[in-house]
Amino acid sequence: MAIFFRGGGASMSYQQIRIVLKNDLSEITKLHGELENFGQKCSLSSKTLFELNLILEEVLANVISYAYRDNRRHEIVVRADLGDGELVIEVEDDGRPFNPLQIPPPDLDRPLRERNVGGLGLHLVRELTSSIEYSRREEKNHLVMRKKAEKSEPRQRWT
């Protein structure tokens, strides 16, 4: 895993993170710590940070589990940019073309035994984001998700 931070200047918090992961499910666990560090530097609320972790866990688990037809090592690039109260989250992979926007939402009104298997993770991602865009460029999938970013409340100092 490789991690890159970029800030807006000496007086500003880091506003961007870029993480390169291998196509191995154990990499998701490593991602959580880096997102925690990013969230602290950007003063993200615990709710926003939890939802960011959940979104990326769902997306990355799907990419790692289903995108590759071989057992070779592949890189998955995750970017998160914070600006104007919004997180822009991008996941880029070189797996098989897959547009998650073409998957219909699950029918949650049907009894559990009658529902199709799968689709709940993507449904969760849709619920936690304000928009999702997909494109296929240069033999890579690009998934861009936007989410409102709440800041953590400043801690009160007792004197």
Model segments located where?
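Helix-loop-beta hinge of the Bergerat
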Residues: 14-46
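Conserved short strand/loop->alpha-helix "switch" segment adjacent to the catalytic nucleotide/phosphoryl-transfer site
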Residues: 35-57, 114-116
